[in-house]
C-alpha cells in the first residue's frame, strides 16, 4: 500500500512538472563546474545557481585552513558539544563572531550549529514555548516555517513585507512573549525585509525579532557583517541567525543574541544538544573565511559582486520585458527571473544547459503557484564576461522559442 501511494504521488509530481532530481558535481564549487548524471560523463557548465556569493568555497586559504584543522583536530568531533565534542576551534569561531556582533546586540554571544536549518529550528522551538506567539513573514524560508510548526507557540502569519498588517497583529496580541520571525534577504526573491520598521514595531509592542540573514551575511555591509551592519541596526531585541555555507564558503550556521538567550539555547535547544558537533576542522576553516570577508579582499569581492549584479540587471530588464517575464525587484546576489509556468521554467533551464549554462528552475511548493522562475545567483568569482554570456544565452533561448 505504501509503495503504491508513493508511486501515485510521484506520477502526480511528474504530471505537474514538479519532479526534482539531483545532479552530480565532479569538481569544486566554482563558476565553471563539471556536472553530470549518475552513470554518465560530466560536462563543464557555467553555473549561476550556487550560493557561494563571494567565491570562497574554493579559496586556497580556506582550503589550507581546513587541511590544517583536520591535521590538528582530526576528521570528526566525536561527540555532541555538551559531551566532549566542543573544540577550541568551535570556541574561537564563536568568540570571533561575537566580536562582529557586539556593536549590534547587547551582551552578544554566539552559538555555532552544523546547518542553518538546525539553527532556525533550534531558536524557534527553544523560544517558542507554550504561551508565546510567533509572528511569521509569509515568505519565510522552509526551515523557519518548520521550526514554527514544531514550536508550542501560537503562530500568526503576516503578508509579505506588510508592516501595517503586522502592527495590527501585534497590537491585538496579549501574549507574554512575542517574536517577529523573518528572513532578511528573501531566498527566492532577493529583496530585503523592512527591518528598521520591524525593529520599531518590536520596541513598541515589547517583541523580539528573529532575523535569518542566510543570504546577507558576508555580502551586505561595509565589512560583510550582514544586514545589521548594512542598515546600522542595534538592539538587545535582535536574535540574528547567519549561515556559514553560503557567502562564507564552508558549512554551518550560528545564532548571535544576548548572552542570556544563548545560554538558554545551550541548555534547551534540542537540535543543538542532541547531535554530534561539526568537525573542528570546519570551524578552523571558517576562521580563515571570516578574516577574508572582513578584510580588503572581502571588500574587493563584494565590489566585484556588485558589478556583476548591475551588469545582469541592466541586460535582463529589456530581455524580460520583451519575453513577457518579470524581473524581481532585487539588488542582491539572488536575481529571480519569473517565468510563471512550471513547464516553461524547466524548458528555459534546459535550453540554457544545452548552451553550456546551468541555472536552476524553481517551482512550487518552493515558490507560490504561477511564479515558477529561474533563480539566478551571482558570485564574486563570476566575471562580467560570464554574465554577458548568460544574457546572450537567454536571448538565444527567447529567439528559439519565438521561432518555434
Curated annotation (Swiss-Prot):
Pfam families on file: Aminotran_1_2
Molecular function (Gene Ontology), one example: 8-amino-7-oxononanoate synthase activity
InterPro entries cross-referenced by the UniProt entry: Aminotransferase_I/II_large (IPR004839), AON_synthase_class-II (IPR050087), AONS_Archaea/Proteobacteria (IPR004723), AONS_Proteobacteria (IPR022834), PyrdxlP-dep_Trfase (IPR015424), PyrdxlP-dep_Trfase_major (IPR015421), PyrdxlP-dep_Trfase_small (IPR015422)
Keyword NAD: no
UniProt-listed GO biological process terms: biotin biosynthetic process
Cofactor(s) of this protein: pyridoxal 5'-phosphate
Involved pathway(s): Cofactor biosynthesis; biotin biosynthesis
Protein name stated in the entry: 8-amino-7-oxononanoate synthase
Native source species: Cupriavidus taiwanensis (strain DSM 17343 / BCRC 17206 / CCUG 44338 / CIP 107171 / LMG 19424 / R1)
Amino acid at each position: 500500500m505504501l509503495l503504491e501511494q508513493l508511486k501515485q504521488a510521484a506520477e502526480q509530481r511528474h504530471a505537474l512538472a514538479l519532479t526534482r532530481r539531483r545532479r552530480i558535481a565532479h569538481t569544486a564549487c566554482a563558476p565553471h563546474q563539471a556536472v553530470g548524471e549518475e552513470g554518465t560523463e560530466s560536462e563543464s557548465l557555467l553555473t549561476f545557481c550556487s550560493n557561494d556569493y563571494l567565491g570562497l568555497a574554493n579559496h586556497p586559504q580556506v582550503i589550507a585552513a581546513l587541511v590544517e584543522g583536520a591535521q590538528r583536530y582530526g576528521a570528526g568531533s566525536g561527540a555532541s558539544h555538551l559531551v566532549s565534542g566542543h573544540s577550541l576551534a568551535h570556541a574561537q569561531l564563536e568568540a570571533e563572531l561575537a566580536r562582529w556582533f557586539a556593536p549590534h546586540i547587547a551582551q552578544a554571544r554566539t552559538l555555532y550549529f552544523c546547518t542553518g536549518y538546525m539553527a532556525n529550528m533550534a531558536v524557534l522551538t527553544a523560544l517558542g514555548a507554550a504561551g508565546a506567539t510567533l509572528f511569521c513573514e509569509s515568505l519565510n524560508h522552509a526551515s523557519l516555517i518548520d521550526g514554527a510548526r514544531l514550536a508550542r507557540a501560537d503562530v500568526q502569519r503576516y503578508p509579505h513585507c506588510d508592516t501595517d498588517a503586522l502592527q495590527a497583529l501585534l497590537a491585538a496580541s496579549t501574549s507574554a512573549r512575542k517574536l517577529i520571525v523573518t528572513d532578511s534577504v528573501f531566498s527566492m526573491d532577493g529583496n530585503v525585509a523592512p527591518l528598521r520598521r520591524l525593529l520599531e514595531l518590536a520596541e513598541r509592542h515589547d517583541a523580539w525579532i528573529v532575523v535569518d540573514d542566510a543570504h546577507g551575511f558576508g555580502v551586505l555591509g561595509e565589512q560583510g557583517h550582514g544586514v545589521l551592519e548594512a542598515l546600522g541596526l542595534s538592539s538587545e531585541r535582535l536574535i540574528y541567525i547567519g549561515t556559514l555555507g553560503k557567502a562564507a564558503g564552508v558549512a554551518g550556521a550560528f545564532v548571535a543574541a544576548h548572552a542570556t538567550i544563548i545560554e538558554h539555547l545551550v541548555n534547551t535547544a534540542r537540535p543543538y544538544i542532541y547531535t554530534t558537533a561539526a568537525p573542528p576542522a570546519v570551524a578552523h576553516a571558517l576562521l580563515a573565511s571570516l578574516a577574508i570577508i572582513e578584510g580588503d579582499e572581502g571588500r574587493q569581492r563584494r565590489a566585484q559582486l556588485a558589478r556583476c549584479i548591475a551588469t545582469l540587471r541592466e541586460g535582463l530588464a529589456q530581455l524580460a520585458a520583451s519575453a513577457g517575464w518579470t524581473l524581481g525587484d532585487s539588488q542582491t546576489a539572488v536575481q529571480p527571473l519569473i517565468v510563471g509556468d512550471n513547464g516553461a521554467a524547466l524548458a528555459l533551464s534546459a535550453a540554457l544547459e544545452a548552451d553550456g549554462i546551468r541555472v536552476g528552475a524553481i517551482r512550487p511548493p518552493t515558490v507560490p503557484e504561477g511564479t515558477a522562475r529561474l533563480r539566478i545567483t551571482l558570485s564574486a568569482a563570476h566575471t562580467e564576461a560570464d554574465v554577458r554570456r548568460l544574457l546572450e544565452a537567454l536571448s538565444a533561448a527567447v529567439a528559439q522559442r519565438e521561432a518555434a
